[in-house]
């Protein structure tokens, strides 16, 4: 499955520790590390929520219903998966402390921490602390050997499987089709393409829908919890085109499609870099670098071209406070040197950089850069009693971080 999203190799040569993460939420603990400018007044109430078996979007929806407000008034810095015990921050516009204190949601503990003058944004999140129990993994000797090798070569910062979907890893495929201006096929891949691992009954319905492309049948057969698929099919029944239907999706979901395709190309670039160089510590002409900023916890900040101050950049990489950065390609990306290999990957899909400027803003992207190396030295990593504890800067995936140790596929 990993190869389908561009994760094609390991950087370490050690044997895997093996093991698996069980389905119990307590085995996967994640806590946001964030910085806010709090005050005693402001239009935005800031809350800290400890929740179990709640994904972020569903929690925000249920919370808005409990408060009797629009979900648009609730903001957060990042999304968290359902199958975990999570601590996360939310801002709520125009709600008082007394109102939130009357809310009681199952498996969720809500604590008011203050007010702010603006909503929570992605930039407020520095990173996440993880505590993950792995069942059936081997002893700590392999752990130490792998850790040492990662310190020497770098720790690959792939986008994890969850970037591409929860059970059906098709988000990047939808993004590719949108960039190809093939909205009809993008619509049906999202709504109907069957995928191994999905609920058997639902998969069979999708198989029929994939063959027939019958919106009426889909509305009759697809379960109600697949609300986005059903909403799209309803738009077709109302006479809208596949393109118009896709544009009716929530903004954050629309943006995910092209972002997922960018992530797929990034993963392929990172895999190829590892294969060619065997290390993420080597810098070439035309490369970019990302720098750590040390706040409450370290987080990656600006990127720059290596040649702008080559001696300084090489020194910072050697001192482990800067990382090689690879492009998240977009219409403004300037590819130089080694990274021009991205053009070959795009060409395989009949795309180029200009393809990322579409007629719809939410399906366009100018591009950016992402650190290739997680810099394991700053994670505070420990391993005791089959439990990994570590911190990762925002945008880094715990399952990706662990894969070099376990050498097993983690979704």
From Swiss-Prot:
The protein's annotated catalytic reaction(s) are:
uridine(13) in tRNA = pseudouridine(13) in tRNA
Q: Does the keyword Isomerase apply?
A: yes
Stretches assigned to the TRUD domain: 154-375
* Keyword field: Isomerase, tRNA processing
Q: Which InterPro entries match?
A: PsdUridine_synth_cat_dom_sf, PsdUridine_synth_TruD, PsdUridine_synth_TruD_CS, PsdUridine_synth_TruD_insert, TruD_catalytic
Query: Could you state one GO biological process linked to this protein?
Result: tRNA pseudouridine synthesis
Q: Which GO terms describe its molecular function?
A: RNA binding; tRNA pseudouridine(13) synthase activity
**Might you give the EC number(s) for this enzyme?**
5.4.99.27
> Is the Transferase keyword given for this protein?
no
Active-site residues? 81
Q: Which domain of life is it from?
A: Archaea
User: Which top-level enzyme class is recorded in the Swiss-Prot or TrEMBL entry?
Assistant: isomerase
**Which PANTHER family is this protein grouped with?**
PSEUDOURIDYLATE SYNTHASE PUS7L, TRNA PSEUDOURIDINE SYNTHASE D
Q: Give the protein family.
A: Belongs to the pseudouridine synthase TruD family.
Q: Function, please?
A: Could be responsible for synthesis of pseudouridine from uracil-13 in transfer RNAs.
NCBIfam families membership: tRNA_TruD_broad (TIGR00094)
Protein name, per record: Probable tRNA pseudouridine synthase D
């Amino acid at each position: 499955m990993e190869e389908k999203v561009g994760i094609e190799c390991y950087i370490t040569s050690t044997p895997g520790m093996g093991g698996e993460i069980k389905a119990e939420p307590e085995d996967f603990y994640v806590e946001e590390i964030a910085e806010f400018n709090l005050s005693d007044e402001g239009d935005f109430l800031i809350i800290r929520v400890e929740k179990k078996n709640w994904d972020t979007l569903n929690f925000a929806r249920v919370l808005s219903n409990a408060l009797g407000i629009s979900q648009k008034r609730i903001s957060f810095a990042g999304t968290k998966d359902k199958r975990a015990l999570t601590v996360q921050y939310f801002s709520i516009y125009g709600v008082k402390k007394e109102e939130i204190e009357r809310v009681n949601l199952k498996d969720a503990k809500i604590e008011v921490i203050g007010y702010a003058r603006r909503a929570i944004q992605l930039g407020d999140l520095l990173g996440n602390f993880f505590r993950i129990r792995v069942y059936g993994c081997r002893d700590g000797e392999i752990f130490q050997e792998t850790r040492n090798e990662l310190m020497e070569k770098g720790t690959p910062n792939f986008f994890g499987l969850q970037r591409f979907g929860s059970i059906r890893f098709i988000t990047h495929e939808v993004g590719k089709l949108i960039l190809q201006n093939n909205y009809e096929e993008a619509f049906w891949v999202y709504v109907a393409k069957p995928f191994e691992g999905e609920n058997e009954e639902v998969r069979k319905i999708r198989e029929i829908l994939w063959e027939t492309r019958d919106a009426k049948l889909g509305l009759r057969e697809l379960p109600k919890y697949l609300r986005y698929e059903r909403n799209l099919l309803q738009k077709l029944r109302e006479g809208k085109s596949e393109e118009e239907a896709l544009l009716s999706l929530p903004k954050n979901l629309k943006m995910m499609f092209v972002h997922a395709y960018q992530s797929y190309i990034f993963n392929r670039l990172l895999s190829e870099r590892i294969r060619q160089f065997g290390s993420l510590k080597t810098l070439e002409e035309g490369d970019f670098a990302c720098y750590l900023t040390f706040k409450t916890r370290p987080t990656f900040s600006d990127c720059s071209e290596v040649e702008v101050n080559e001696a300084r950049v090489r020194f910072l990489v050697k001192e482990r406070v800067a990382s090689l950065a690879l492009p998240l390609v977009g219409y403004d990306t300037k590819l130089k040197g080694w990274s021009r290999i991205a053009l070959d990957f795009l060409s395989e899909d009949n795309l180029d950089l200009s393809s990322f400027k579409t007629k719809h803003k939410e399906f366009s992207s100018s591009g950016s850069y992402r650190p290739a190396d997680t810099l394991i030295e700053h994670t505070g990593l420990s391993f005791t009693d089959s439990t990994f504890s570590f911190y990762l800067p925002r945008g880094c995936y715990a399952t990706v971080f662990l894969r070099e140790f376990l050498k097993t596929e983690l979704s």
